[in-house]
Every structure is written in C-alpha cells, then in structure tokens.
Amino acid sequence: MKSVEEQLALIKRGADELLVEAELVEKLKRGQPLRIKAGFDPTAPDLHLGHTVLINKLRQFQDLGHQVIFLIGDFTGMIGDPSGKSATRPPLTREQVLDYAETYKSQVFKILDPAKTEVAFNSTWMDKLSPADFIRLSSQYTVARMLERDDFDKRYKSNQSIAIHEFLYPLVQGYDSVALKADVELGGTDQKFNLLMGRELQRAYGQEPQCILTMPLLEGLDGVKKMSKSLGNYVGIQEAPGIMYSKLVSIPDSLMWRYFELLSFRSMEEINGLRADCEAGANPRDIKIKLAEELVARFHGEEAAATAHRSAGNRMKEGELPDDLPEISVAAIEDMPISAVLNKAGLVKNAAVARDLLASGGVRIDGEVVDRSFIVKLGATHVCQAGKKAFGRITLVSDESSK
C-alpha cells in the first residue's frame, strides 16, 4: 500500500472538497483497507462520461487497496433525488429501477475491477425497516434543518410544494452509510447535503463518521453546462467507438485539461508534460487524440480505438479539420433540424444547398454522415462539415428573448 501522502495526493486529484482531511489521514494511517461508498440511483439506462467521474475515483481507491462499495439505490430510486430540482420528481417503479440497475452493472465494470467491488442494493436493509425504525430515523433531523438545503429553501419561499417523501431521501441516503459502515463516501458537489447527513446519522447510531469527498460535475461538450443527455452535450459510454472518438477530438481546447484530470488514468506528471508540449507549440488536436484513444479503448477495446482513429483520418482526407475551427453559436428556442442549423450558421448559402448536401451525403456531424432527419438538440455542440471546405463547431444556444 502506498504511503499516506501518496494516497492523499491521488484521492484529492480533481476533487472539489474533502471533509475532513485530518480525519481521513488518521483513517489511512491505520494501514487497513477503508470502505469506500458511492451511491447511484438507476434513473436512466445509459451512463455518460459525466457519471464516470465518480466511478473513476472509485477505481483509484481500488488501486490504492481499499474496498469499494458500488451502491445501487433501488430503494431511493423509487423516491427520486430532489437535489437541485425545482419540482417534485416522479418516482420510478421497482421494475424500472431493477432493469436500469442491470445495465449499470455491465457498464461500470468497464472501469471497476469486479473482483474488488462489492455491489449493494439499499433495498436490502431499507425494506426491512419497520414503521418504528423509520420514525426513529426521521427523528434524527428537523424540518428546519431540511429547509436549510438550498433547493428546498427556494421551493419553500416560492410557495412550491415539497412532498414529505422528498425529506426522506437524504435520510435514507445517510442511513445507507450506517448500514454499510462506510469510511468514505463520494458524491457530486450537488450531493454535499446528503453526504453530510451520512456523517450525522453515523454519529447518532454510534459509528465513527465517514469522510466525504465531493467531485465536480463534468462540463459537457459545450464547455459550459454540466454534461446531460437531455442537453445533447454528452458522450455516452455505450456510443459507437467512432462517434465517441469524434466527439472527444472536437471538444474545445479550453476543456481538454479538465477532461484529462477527471477522466484519464494518466498520471498528473504525464498530463502536465502534455500541457507543456501544448504550450511549446504542439497541436491541441494531437493532444485530444490521445484522450479520445484512451477513453474509446477503455469502453470498447484497443482495436476499436485504433479503428476509430484510422476511420477519422480517412474521413478527413478530402476536408481536413482546420486548426482554427470557428466557434459558432446559433440561437434557437427549441431543437432544430440540421438543415436549418447549417443555414443559420452560415455554412451553406441557403436552405436549398443544405438540402442538396444532406441528400448527397455531403454533411458530417462529429465525423459521421447524416441526413435531413438529424435534429440538433438545444444546448448541444457538434463539429459540422458541409461539403469539402465549410467547417464549424456549432452550439445551439437558447434564445431566451424569443420565448
């Protein structure tokens, strides 16, 4: 096992906040594997790279010799996490949650070592709690303290409804830490309230409180809003290798170091070396290719990564992407057909030219040929090629003034 200092450096890599660092140091000094918990509510079947920020950190803990608990919130998934929500979230059925959970497991083991991972379902202990147990759990926290949470506070002050079951969510997530005897819990920055709840409940139930490590929410391909499938600015880990590769190679230069730190398993020394190369004049696209190859290989294998790289090179033979790819924002109030986007972005002379190019296979989005049925989602960013010489990284931005 590495020294405490070496472990701490890797644990803190890319992290937003570690509470309480001195407590974690004491836990590490004992020289025993720690129990590292991260919970995931399976609310959708497919994961994207934003979800993997936490999973990557779990893998780093595994590599340091600690015990990782991948907690599937099949019970909490039926409540619906209210974190950051402005309205009550509709609950899922048990069948939906279990179906999604199976797809999660097949995806996360592309990152985690199955032999070193304990998969747990919080229904295992939550289904066994009696009404009296639930009342005891609820008595550990007050409504006033719940309303200190930013999203609840905003809804309360604006006279929006807050259902009682939403107050239960952070209590149940906190109780998961009691049931699992967690030493450390990971979560996104939007989960801090829930993670701190785990510390408080562990104290209330006579346990040593867990440390918490919050990780940032990964920006999507637009480099602005958090990665989200609904915004169209995501990279799905089950997307075809070529699409994943093309999306990653086309991210803004300003975003690539953030992606390296949070998504790559390269050491920070190696990443800093790449940064120095870039500052010395290396083409940023060549650096992004290294990131794209690494991530495609992780989820699809080395051969698929090599094929994606070759295919991307072949696709660009007749129209090499310029180093100074123009950034173009197109205002819209809703999703828009690609023909209209190309026209508004100025990549074609008029709508008729756009239709002709689409019909003849002359339009590529993120390196892939598309037809007139392709719809650009509001908030999405794509590298677009119209014909042989017209290129642009186009973002469909919300035109609030038109609403």
UniProtKB/Swiss-Prot annotation:
It is found in: Cytoplasm. GO terms for molecular function: ATP binding; RNA binding; tyrosine-tRNA ligase activity. A motif ('HIGH' region) lies at residues 42-51. It holds the Pfam family tRNA-synt_1b. A motif ('KMSKS' region) lies at residues 226-230. Gene3D superfamilies: HUPs, RNA-binding S4 domain, Tyrosyl-Transfer RNA Synthetase. GO terms for biological process: tyrosyl-tRNA aminoacylation. Keywords: Aminoacyl-tRNA synthetase, ATP-binding, Cytoplasm, Ligase, Nucleotide-binding, Protein biosynthesis, RNA-binding. It comes from the Bacteria. The keyword Cytoplasm applies. One of its GO terms (cellular component) is cytosol. It is an enzyme of class 6 (ligase). It catalyses: tRNA(Tyr) + L-tyrosine + ATP = L-tyrosyl-tRNA(Tyr) + AMP + diphosphate + H(+). ATP binds at residue 229. Residues 336-396 form the S4 RNA-binding domain. PROSITE patterns: AA_TRNA_LIGASE_I, S4. Its EC number is 6.1.1.1. HAMAP family: Tyr_tRNA_synth_type2. Catalyzes the attachment of tyrosine to tRNA(Tyr) in a two-step reaction: tyrosine is first activated by ATP to form Tyr-AMP and then transferred to the acceptor end of tRNA(Tyr). Homodimer. PANTHER family: TYROSINE--TRNA LIGASE, TYROSYL-TRNA SYNTHETASE. Belongs to the class-I aminoacyl-tRNA synthetase family. TyrS type 2 subfamily. This is Tyrosine--tRNA ligase. It comes from Pseudomonas syringae pv. tomato (strain ATCC BAA-871 / DC3000). The lineage of its organism: Bacteria, Pseudomonadati, Pseudomonadota, Gammaproteobacteria, Pseudomonadales. The gene is tyrS.
